[in-house]
Structure formats: C-alpha cells, structure tokens
Amino acid sequence: MGIRYYRPYTAGTRQKTSSDFAEITRDRPEKSLVKAKHRAKGRNNRGVITSRRRGGGHKRRYRIIDFYRNKLGVPGTIATVEYDPNRNARIALVNYKDGEKRYILHPRNVQVGTTIVAGPDAPIEVGNALPLERIPLGTEVHNVELIPGKGGQLARAAGALAQVVAKEGKMVTLKLPSGEVRLFQKECYATIGQVGNVESNNITIGKAGRNRWKARRPKVRGSVMNPVDHPHGGGEGRAPIGRSGPVTPWGKPTLGYKTRKKKKQSNKLIVRRRRRSSKRSRGGRQS
C-alpha cells in the first residue's frame, strides 16, 4: 500500500492524504459472504444514547470474515484482495479446494494466487494458521485467539502483529501490539505474519466531512457547555473546571483513571502491563 497526496485545490484537500488502493484487485464483494448491517447510531434497544458522537455516515454491508480458520488441512488459494468498509485492514477472498469460499484478513505481502492452509501441521508461512504451541519463538502472528475455538480476537487491525516470546508447559507467552505481555493456552490458534495495510495510521483525514462519512460526529468540550450539561461547564468566559481533576459528564474521574477491575480473572495471565496512554490525568485537560 502507498499513500496518495493531493494538491491544495481546496481547504479540504490541503492536508488530506488517502490510500492509493494499489493492492485492491476487486471492487465488488462476494455476494454469498455479505449481509445487511443495521447501525445502531450509538443507541440501545430503548433508543437512549449510550455511546456519544455516533450517527450518520455512509451505508455499509457487512463482510463475513473467517476469524476461526477452522478448515483444518484444506488448502485454499487467495483469489482477490478487497476493500472492507468495516475495518482499516484489507480482506482476502480464499477459494478452498473443496469449493467453499471465505474471507480472511489480508496478511502483509500475501499476493493473489498464494496457497494457504490451517492446521497443526501447516508450514510456517505467512497466511497459514497454527496452534501457538507449533509456532517458533520470535514469529510474528495476528488474529490470535483468547480462548481455543472461539476465533481470533487480538491483533486484527491494519498493521497489527503480536510476537511469540516464550513457551512453558501449557502456556505460550505473546507480546501484544499494546506492549502487554500475556499468557495464552497453547491450543489457541494464530495466523502467521502481520496484518496488511500497514500505512493506515499515517493517513490524514484532512477535513471534518471525512469523519462524518465514517459516522463520527463532533466532540464538544465539557468546558464550553452549560453547568446543566457537564460538570466542567459554566463560569464567566474561559473558566477552569473547578475540580481537582477532569471528570466525565456523569461525574466519574477520567483521563488516567483506572477502570479495570482489580480482581479480574485474567489478571493472572498478564505478565507485563501495556504501555501507559499519553492521556493522563492533568489539571487543565478537558473531556
């Protein structure tokens, strides 16, 4: 993938960049692997907003992705590389030898015509899926299962990868994209290689309208609201928030406040915590 730059014909194109889509080989999805997608626009079943700043955006159809990779021992050939509006990674259509078709996340540098296979005896090649116990130390993987048979849940975004760093007994240690080092059951499956479209993080939106196409609505600072709408609101002109630290619209501490349960079961599987976010609690920060 490359990044396309634009001449500043308008204010919206001055800073804008986008993908050149050079890796895309087909512009229409496989009909049998597409279904309608209802978008909740941030509302729950009662119509109450539970996730702010969602709504609008372009209509999408959902591509059914095979995160399970459970066609063991059946080879498949990469037929196409396609755009998926529901994720920043590309997807690849796989034609299996038994006639079935499935979409998978497109691994980096995998070309049309490449043969892939899943199973404990699969070769260590990019695009193949194996149990973690069969993957050599130092190997980069993606689409990692948290629970055997549940399907890949980790390292699925564009450019994401995890690394196998140790094996001991029934557990395998992986370093995740967040920097967290965590234990996994050795039976969990993962796919060899890195997710494609690695330049996705370097794209500049350029104008507000592109975010609206993605159903992302504007984010209003609490400090410019009225007191009835936000704890940071009110005051004459640009007033401080009047608290020891920033809070959410419902009065809960935010920006650096730990929300993970202290007695969560999976705590014992975490060897090293993820890197701390740059959004830490500071007096002048607004939410």
From Swiss-Prot:
Matches recorded under SMART domains: Ribosomal_L2, Ribosomal_L2_C
Any Pfam family hit: Ribosomal_L2
Region Disordered, annotated ranges: 209-287
GO molecular function: rRNA binding; structural constituent of ribosome; transferase activity
Protein's GO biological process: translation
Protein origin, superkingdom: Bacteria
Keyword Transferase: no
Keyword terms of this UniProt record: Ribonucleoprotein, Ribosomal protein, RNA-binding, rRNA-binding
Listed Basic residues bias regions: 209-220, 258-287
GO cellular component: large ribosomal subunit
Chain segments annotated as coiled-coil in the UniProt record: none
Assembly: Part of the 50S ribosomal subunit. Forms a bridge to the 30S subunit in the 70S ribosome.
Stated role: One of the primary rRNA binding proteins. Required for association of the 30S and 50S subunits to form the 70S ribosome, for tRNA binding and peptide bond formation. It has been suggested to have peptidyltransferase activity; this is somewhat controversial. Makes several contacts with the 16S rRNA in the 70S ribosome.
Family per record: Belongs to the universal ribosomal protein uL2 family.
Protein name: Large ribosomal subunit protein uL2
Gene: rplB
